[in-house]
């Protein structure tokens, strides 16, 4: 019985540690992979082909120059 209680407490403690140490995905929009790459490639000679607004995209699609929300490429101003 004591061993079971110790195991339950240990699992709860480790779960709490994982939740505390997990990355916060709310800041993903501020530091997205696309924006970081654009900052590194920001030269006058670099041209990107962008998808038009309201075209289908995926969440990791780099052809959507603006935001990809619900599989649609949206223009943010």
Curated annotation (Swiss-Prot):
Expression by tissue: Expressed by the venom duct.
A Pfam short name: Conotoxin
Cleaved propeptide residues: 23-46
MF terms in GO: ion channel inhibitor activity; toxin activity
Keywords of the record: Cleavage on pair of basic residues, Disulfide bond, Knottin, Neurotoxin, Pyrrolidone carboxylic acid, Secreted, Signal, Toxin
InterPro entries in the cross-refs: Conotoxin (IPR004214)
Compartment(s) where it occurs, according to its Swiss-Prot or TrEMBL record: Secreted
Domain notes: The presence of a 'disulfide through disulfide knot' structurally defines this protein as a knottin.
Similarity comment: Belongs to the conotoxin O1 superfamily.
The protein's name: Conotoxin ArMKLT2-022
Species of origin: Conus arenatus (Sand-dusted cone)
Lineage: Eukaryota, Metazoa, Spiralia, Lophotrochozoa, Mollusca
């Amino acid at each position: 019985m004591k061993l079971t209680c110790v195991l339950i407490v240990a699992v709860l403690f480790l779960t709490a540690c994982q939740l505390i140490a997990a990355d916060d995905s709310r800041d993903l929009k501020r530091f997205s992979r696309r924006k970081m790459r654009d900052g590194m490639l920001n030269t006058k000679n670099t041209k990107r082909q962008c998808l038009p607004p309201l075209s289908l995209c995926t969440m990791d699609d780099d052809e959507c120059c603006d935001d990809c929300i619900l599989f649609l490429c949206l223009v943010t101003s």
